[in-house]
């Protein structure tokens, strides 16, 4: 294989932070190279330097052995670098062809769009990827996997020979992820070099050739995939051995106070009617395949989605909860699946995000915010959940995924919530940060807070939950507890391998 990309002795600093220190990284033609590290290790900064978003303070970039100087994102794309970020750059109301050629549309001598030519090129790229996409539909009508293939097609239309894929399977089903891997293998055979960023070790071992590990802005080492064990990689990432990321479970008490009694939640007329209870200080897991109705049931309970029938009591009192605001007044908070879009205001500081839902708590006469009091509350709560940041004035958009999730938790602690709904709480979060989130959840339940945890990661559901409600096709088919909370039992019920008793 030929050396396609070399990053040599790259360093980058921000005010008060040394983000990268003397990092070197090499990508071969036709290689899939994993870039591993905890959130905050420097992966995103390094890739933003590669794609021209940031300019390095020291070091150089070489493509095909020749030095390049990227002062802008377009410089990188012109040099054959394509990046598929976690947050897609697609315009939702435009179709796939329009998105692929956005900003560089093909036109004739009169300035008219050459739509047939653009469509023909788009079809050719899709054939190269071996994907079948409705090129005429607005991209927001496509599945997440199809949108991702549009992003890849967009990069390939620019003759990208270097692709960076940042957590590409985070929102994909297993079948969609396998389809993506087939596409990646095809591109690999065509000589495209790929940088693959993922926190899922099984994916690294399935698709990658080589691994480079970063920690705290330093390169810890690189390894061939077939020559390194998972435990060694984890130790390289976090700087210590990880024996078990899940906290020890305490014996389940069946006599605990019932905080939520959902006697009936029906999303659609003639649809299934679900019922469940949540006890004080327990973690109730919602498990099931993607599209099984887990999130929809939780959102309907708190009024974020409509329900044609809802009978719910909170601490023994009937609760209509027609809106999330009413649910919040009842002491129920939601940590949404998409924390960046729905859980946080990224340009706002840590302080502003923590106090946003309860400004009355930090306001004085005439409802004027007491900045000193606000800062004290934010600092106390951020310390409690161990947010890693220079100070509470740091914009949350500058934080790692794990620290962003901690800010969302701190916000709900500021509201003294009795029940927290965690929707995919560790999605896009590294191993070390996951352990901290689990520790926080355990601390909250020890203080009497009840948690509903919706997760697509079976080890997480099994390792954290006291009881598990298993969903299939919109219906809770079984509630497991004790020794029955294991991966085999959950999958048997989730896939229809057994009937509910």
UniProtKB/Swiss-Prot annotation:
Catalytic activity: D-ribose(out) + ATP + H2O = D-ribose(in) + ADP + phosphate + H(+)
Protein family according to the UniProt entry: Belongs to the ABC transporter superfamily. Ribose importer (TC 3.A.1.2.1) family.
Higher taxonomy: Bacteria, Pseudomonadati, Pseudomonadota, Gammaproteobacteria, Oceanospirillales
Binding of ATP, residues: 37-44
Primary gene name: rbsA
Keywords: ATP-binding, Cell inner membrane, Cell membrane, Membrane, Nucleotide-binding, Repeat, Sugar transport, Translocase, Transport
Protein's job: Part of the ABC transporter complex RbsABC involved in ribose import. Responsible for energy coupling to the transport system.
Location (main, coarse): membrane
GO cellular component, one term: plasma membrane
Membrane-protein topology: Peripheral membrane protein
Its EC number(s): 7.5.2.7
Record-level Gene Ontology MF annotations: ABC-type D-ribose transporter activity; ATP binding; ATP hydrolysis activity
Alphabetized SUPFAM superfamilies for the sequence: P-loop containing nucleoside triphosphate hydrolases
Subunit (UniProt): The complex is composed of an ATP-binding protein (RbsA), two transmembrane proteins (RbsC) and a solute-binding protein (RbsB).
Top-rank taxon, per record: Bacteria
Protein name per UniProt: Ribose import ATP-binding protein RbsA
Keyword ATP-binding: yes
Source organism: Hahella chejuensis (strain KCTC 2396)
Location of the protein in the cell: Cell inner membrane
């Amino acid at each position: 294989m030929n050396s396609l990309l070399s990053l040599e002795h790259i360093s980058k600093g921000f005010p008060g932070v040394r983000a990268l220190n003397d990092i070197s990284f090499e990508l071969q033609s036709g290689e899939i190279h994993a870039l591993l590290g905890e959130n905050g290790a420097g992966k995103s900064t390094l890739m933003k330097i590669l794609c021209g978003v940031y300019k390095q303070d020291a070091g150089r970039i070489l493509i095909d052995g020749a030095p390049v100087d990227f002062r802008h994102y377009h410089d990188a794309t012109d040099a054959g670098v394509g990046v598929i970020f976690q947050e897609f750059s697609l315009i939702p109301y435009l179709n796939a062809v329009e998105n692929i050629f956005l900003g560089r549309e093909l036109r004739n001598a009169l300035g008219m769009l050459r739509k047939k030519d653009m469509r023909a090129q788009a079809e050719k790229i899709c054939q190269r990827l071996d994907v079948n996409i409705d090129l005429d539909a607005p991209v927001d009508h496509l599945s997440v996997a199809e949108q991702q293939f549009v992003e890849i097609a967009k990069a390939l239309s620019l003759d990208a020979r270097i692709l960076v894929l940042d957590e590409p399977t985070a929102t994909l089903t297993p079948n969609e992820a396998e389809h993506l891997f087939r596409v990646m293998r095809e591109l690999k055979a065509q000589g495209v070099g790929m940088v693959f960023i993922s926190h899922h070790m099984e994916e690294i071992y399935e698709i990658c050739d080589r691994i480079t590990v970063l920690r705290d802005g330093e390169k810890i080492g690189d390894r061939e995939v077939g020559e390194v064990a998972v435990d060694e990689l984890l130790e390289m990432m976090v700087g210590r051995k990880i024996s078990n990321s899940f906290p020890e479970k305490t014996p389940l008490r069946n006599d605990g106070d019932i905080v939520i009694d959902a006697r009936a939640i029906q999303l659609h007329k003639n649809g299934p009617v679900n019922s469940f209870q949540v006890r004080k200080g327990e973690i109730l897991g919602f498990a099931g395949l993607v599209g099984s109705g887990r999130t929809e049931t939780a959102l309907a309970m708190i009024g974020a989605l409509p329900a044609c029938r809802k009978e719910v009591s909170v601490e023994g009192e009937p609760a209509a909860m027609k809106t999330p605001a009413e649910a919040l007044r009842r002491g129920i908070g939601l940590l949404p699946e998409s924390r960046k879009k729905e859980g946080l205001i990224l340009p706002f500081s840590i302080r502003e995000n923590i106090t946003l839902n309860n400004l009355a708590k930090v306001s004085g006469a005439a409802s004027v915010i007491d900045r000193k009091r606000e800062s004290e509350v934010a600092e106390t709560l951020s310390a409690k959940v161990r947010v890693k940041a220079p100070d509470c004035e740091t914009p949350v958009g500058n934080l790692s995924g794990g620290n962003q999730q901690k800010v969302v938790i701190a916000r709900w602690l500021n509201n003294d919530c009795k029940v927290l709904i965690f929707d995919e709480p560790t999605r896009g979060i590294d191993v070390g940060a996951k352990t901290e989130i689990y520790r926080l959840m355990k601390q909250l339940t020890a203080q009497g807070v009840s948690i509903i945890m919706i997760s697509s990661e079976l080890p997480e559901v099994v390792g954290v939950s006291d009881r598990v409600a298993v969903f299939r096709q919109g219906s809770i088919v079984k509630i497991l507890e004790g020794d029955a909370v294991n991966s085999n039992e959950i999958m048997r019920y989730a896939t229809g391998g057994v009937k509910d008793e």
